[in-house]
């Protein structure tokens, strides 16, 4: 059996996933153990053989349904492809079995993660609170409870968890302070949070905690209308975070898109569109351009569910690119066909349909602007909404916030941020030039907040859904959100953020020049 595993890994390293898949298919079912299955599922994932993997798991269930490792692997695979309830059912059965406490803890974390990632924040919160009772001194559990309270806009709940976290580990609470301060409007310089944060900053903290505390102070002093002090803290926070992204290159982004553009020649544009019907509304643009506000409004319609920032399309796009075109943009641009895009659309639809039962789903990952043309060719009836906003307000709103993950690697440096913004404008101008006139609906943030009913009527006409004035009362929705806009999610449309950059201009001239 070890020989099999060595041979499979050798095939992957030398000949690629396709050859490894052909070899794996020849192994009899009764010879597939958990180690081989783990590799098999990874291979299937990398060459888009999802249906084969699902069938394989069902065939193995008869033999391995009491095997805890098999059940865990099955739950992980189902989680990755939108089978939320099935995955949780398996994990729930596993946590009740006689297993090692550390394995049970791992399962608890996974169940909470699945609930949270599928936007079931209330359920995730209830589960994490139950989990917390089992492990009261586990730092990450209390942090996850805090995050769920934050997603639901619950300052008191988040604040109480911060108190717990400070007792467990007082020197690693930077993120927790930042999250909690996002939920509160500060009105007095005597607020105890200010002294607490400044006291922590005087200690020997890691750079991540320190930068998050600085972002928190920037927000607090902005609330207090001390824009000079606020700007100083934001600059210090960004300078600290930018050290992690010293290798960022806008030229790499430009070169990448230049290769993508080569696909959209006249012959390709004249080819017939796919037959895939899409129930997603794609909202694209820069971060902090009004995408969350728009999602809140749209999801007030009973037919539309909020999906949040779904990376599903880019996941399948990149899998096809890596597998079929060997990670080569030249190979990709010269050989991609409409069939490849149809496959991406089919894979996307399968996963989205498993996750959501509504007529329409919102996918508001701003980064999808890079794939706008490909999205439009992957489906027959694509609806793409491009959110635009005053450039300087976008730059400021990005610069004064911390972003999780490494996708937004340009945000902590003023030159990188401005260069990326220009790159985004160039990309969207290109799509507007080559795509049909009605492919993209442009929604301007300033127009939306000034004349919401007029702008939304036009948008709903584009979406082919009847507009109702009650959608303007979106702030009455009780759903939670993951993004930085949580403190605005449950408020009416307001105009305070319009031209806010002018308040910071005297202290951040390098950002707006």
Q: Where do the model's predicted regions map?
A:
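Structural register within alpha-helical repeat arrays
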Residues: 7, 39-40, 74, 111, ...
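TPR alpha-solenoid repeat register
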Residues: 36, 70, 104-107, 141, ...
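Conserved phosphate-donor/acceptor-positioning beta-strand/loop module used by diverse small-molecule
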Residues: 375-400
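PAPS-dependent sulfotransferases, especially Golgi type II membrane carbohydrate sulfotransferases
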Residues: 159-161, 177, 194-206, 214-280, ...
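Phosphate-binding active sites in nucleotide-utilizing proteins
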Residues: 273-379, 387
